[in-house]
């Protein structure tokens, strides 16, 4: 994805820009505001025009942006607010859309539409990451890696990808900014988010978590399954044993949970290939109850 024409200059470029404009060195720690063109570009991407333009800048400013000088205003407060209001408006939407659905499936459906991966997808699909103000040295590379991996999972990876948290944060902070600017109007927030997140994950497109699907598959085929993650701290690897035999393995250094999910997916793919099977039936109530007791955090 190419940077849009109004993307903000990097933090390292800003002192030289100041010098060009003012014929003198920028004061230590100087951070120029976003220009009107940048703000307008963000508003265009969001489909919302702010009354208080300063909220746009606040929503896009990462804590690293002021390093090594004293901290300024960052997106953290707006992120907190946006997280809460997104949970509320999406909860309302799935509740009204699926009138007969029980709390368990409703919770999974809501989570799929507001989790870190879904919101990170929103950020990169609309190019919001180009306007992020930060000085985190490895962040741009992490975002690029995430974008390259997205093509493997058109809708959602269900726990197989590890998106940079800042992408999720910036969507939440912008939603929080819209909520504030609209005088706390949840309907406006929903209208904006619905367009940004299109297509929303529906009951028909809601995927299964690889660990839950693995346990369901093994129960149906009368196999014993064990996920071995005790050695992750030493070798960054998680293994899946089926009837005592190692069937799936995955290594991921950053998070044990991702290694666990990828190992479960590898084991599941191998089992299905062995049986010539591509899909499983919907999760039974008995298996669903057992799955709810499984630790999916990788701890």
Swiss-Prot record:
State the SUPFAM superfamilies in the record: dsRNA-binding domain-like (SSF54768), RNase III domain-like (SSF69065)
Q: Which cofactor does it need?
A: Mg(2+); Mn(2+)
What Gene Ontology terms describe what this protein does at the molecular function level?
Answer: metal ion binding; ribonuclease III activity; RNA binding
Any one of the GO CC terms: nucleus
- Please tell me whether the keyword Secreted is annotated for this protein: no
UniProt xrefs under CDD domains: DSRM_EIF2AK2-like (cd19875), RIBOc (cd00593)
Q: What is its EC number?
A: 3.1.26.-
User: Which residues lie within the region annotated Disordered?
Assistant: 274-299
Q: Where is this site: Important for activity?
A: 165
Q: Report the protein name in the record.
A: Ribonuclease 3-like protein 3
């Amino acid at each position: 994805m190419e940077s849009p024409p109004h993307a903000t200059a990097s933090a390292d470029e800003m002192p030289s820009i100041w010098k060009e404009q003012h014929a003198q060195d920028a004061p230590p720690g100087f951070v120029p505001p976003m220009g009107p063109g940048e703000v307008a570009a963000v508003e265009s991407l969001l489909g919302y025009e702010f009354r208080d333009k300063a909220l746009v800048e606040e929503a896009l400013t990462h804590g690293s942006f002021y390093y090594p000088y004293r901290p300024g205003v960052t997106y953290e407060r707006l992120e907190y607010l946006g997280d809460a209001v997104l949970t509320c408006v999406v909860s309302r939407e799935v509740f009204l859309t699926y009138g007969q659905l029980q709390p368990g499936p409703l919770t999974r459906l809501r989570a799929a539409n507001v989790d870190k991966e879904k919101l990170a997808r929103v950020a990169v699909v609309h190019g919001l990451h180009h306007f992020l103000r930060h000085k985190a040295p490895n962040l741009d590379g992490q975002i690029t890696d995430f974008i390259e991996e997205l093509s493997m999972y058109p809708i959602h990876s269900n726990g197989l990808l590890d998106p940079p948290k800042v992408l999720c944060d910036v969507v939440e902070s912008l939603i929080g900014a819209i909520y504030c600017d609209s005088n706390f109007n949840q309907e406006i927030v929903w209208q904006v988010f619905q367009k940004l997140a299109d297509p929303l994950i529906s009951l028909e497109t809601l995927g299964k978590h690889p660990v839950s699907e693995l346990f369901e598959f093994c129960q149906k085929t009368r196999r014993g399954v064990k996920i071995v993650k005790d050695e992750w701290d030493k070798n960054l690897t998680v293994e899946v044993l089926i009837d005592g035999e190692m069937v799936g393995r995955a290594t991921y250094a950053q998070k044990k949970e991702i290694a666990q999910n990828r190992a479960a997916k590898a084991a599941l793919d191998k089992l299905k290939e062995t049986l010539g099977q591509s899909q499983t039936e919907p999760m039974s109530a008995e298996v669903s109850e057992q799955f709810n007791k499984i630790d999916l955090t990788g701890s």
